[in-house]
Curated annotation (Swiss-Prot):
The lineage of its organism: Archaea, Methanobacteriati, Thermoplasmatota, Thermoplasmata, Thermoplasmatales. InterPro entries: AceGlu_kinase-like_sf (IPR036393), Asp/Glu/Uridylate_kinase (IPR001048), Carb_kinase (IPR003964). One of its GO terms (molecular function) is carbamate kinase activity. Pathway: Metabolic intermediate metabolism; carbamoyl phosphate degradation; CO(2) and NH(3) from carbamoyl phosphate: step 1/1. One of its GO terms (cellular component) is cytosol. Pfam families: AA_kinase (PF00696). The gene is arcC. Keywords: Arginine metabolism, ATP-binding, Cytoplasm, Kinase, Nucleotide-binding, Transferase. It is an enzyme of class 2 (transferase). It is found in: Cytoplasm. It comes from Thermoplasma acidophilum (strain ATCC 25905 / DSM 1728 / JCM 9062 / NBRC 15155 / AMRC-C165). This is Carbamate kinase. The keyword Iron does not apply. Gene3D superfamilies: Acetylglutamate kinase-like. GO terms for biological process: arginine deiminase pathway.
Length: 305
């Protein structure tokens, strides 16, 4: 039995262009847990997940309604919103296949440094895409907007995660044979002021936060699931090459060369490198459908010491 942190990508709940309703996200979550059932049943597993579209939707609904909410509150709400979908999907898979583990959704806070340079340079996209005609209206909400290939998106600070405050609870649930859902959306960002903890407006990268969690609970493996089977170098070029088993020094060299896209593959590779350098055995980057093959070493990108 191995201890594994599995970081679900956005495609575990939504595909590009799909309607962001409960039914669509539940259907994807159900298929995700069906694919992962052997991994979750036979190992000690923590599930983490992103919240990019969802937290943007939550924040936008508050801004439009005039009720108002801090971004860190919206992150916490997204943990409950997505956690319910994941918990319902897993519970129904548990019934179908007579699995034994109970699932728990944990509102997870993650400590960051209030002096992190990310607070003066927001780059993390959240929410939907906006057209050129819509962007000025969006800016009236006080949002910082950035142009991407498919349109404009709101960007927010994304500070580096330092510590998972609910780590003892996660450890307890694992030790007692449960399946925790934690660090949703990278965790609720908080800062320490003296002896007090307070929320701060940001969205933490869920892969980097998952790496911090995996190190803290002494996980054997970090598995980052996305919409491709492998990490590629020279992506989209004639000499594109998929990476299979790669030593941490080699993939770190590719990272420094700028081989991996900002906001997409780059943070996943960074998370894998940090995990291995902090004592992890292996990190996997692959698709949900390929997870079993990756664990057995047959496919996917596997980062080792």
């Amino acid at each position: 039995m191995s201890r594994i942190v599995i970081a679900l990508g956005g495609n575990a709940l939504l595909q590009n262009g799909e309607k962001r309703d409960y039914e669509t996200q539940y259907e994807h979550a159900y298929k995700t847990f069906e694919s992962l059932r052997f991994v979750t049943e036979d190992n000690e597993v923590v599930i983490t997940h992103g919240n990019g579209p969802q937290v943007g939707d939550i924040q936008q609904s508050h801004d439009i309604s005039g009720i108002g909410a801090y971004l860190h509150q919206s992150v916490a709400m997204s943990q409950g919103y997505i956690g319910e979908i994941l918990a319902n999907a897993y519970t129904n898979i548990k019934t179908k296949y007579n699995l034994r583990k109970n699932i728990f959704t944990i509102i997870t806070r993650v400590l960051v440094d209030e002096n992190d340079p990310a607070f003066s340079n927001p780059e993390k996209p959240i929410g939907r895409y906006y057209s050129d005609a819509e962007v000025e209206e969006a800016r009236k909400n006080g949002w910082i907007m950035k142009k991407f290939r498919d349109g404009w998106r709101r960007v927010v600070p994304s500070p580096d995660p330092r510590q998972i405050l609910e780590e003892p609870v996660i450890e307890y649930l694992l030790h007692n044979g449960n399946l925790p859902i934690a660090v949703g959306g990278g965790g609720v960002p908080v800062v320490r002021k003296g002896e007090q903890i307070h929320g701060i407006d940001a969205v933490i990268d869920k892969d980097l936060a998952s790496s911090v969690l995996a190190t803290a609970i002494r996980a054997d493996f970090l598995m980052i699931l996305t919409d491709v089977d492998n990490v590629y170098v020279n992506y989209g070029k004639p000499d594109q090459k998929g990476l299979h088993e790669v030593h941490v020094e080699e993939i770190e060299k590719y990272l420094k060369e700028g081989q991996f896209g900002e906001g997409s593959m780059k943070p996943k590779v960074m998370a894998a490198i940090r995990f291995i350098k902090n004592g992890g055995k292996k990190a996997f980057i692959t698709s949900i459908e390929n997870s079993m093959n990756a664990l057995s070493g047959r496919s996917g990108t596997i980062i080792v010491r």
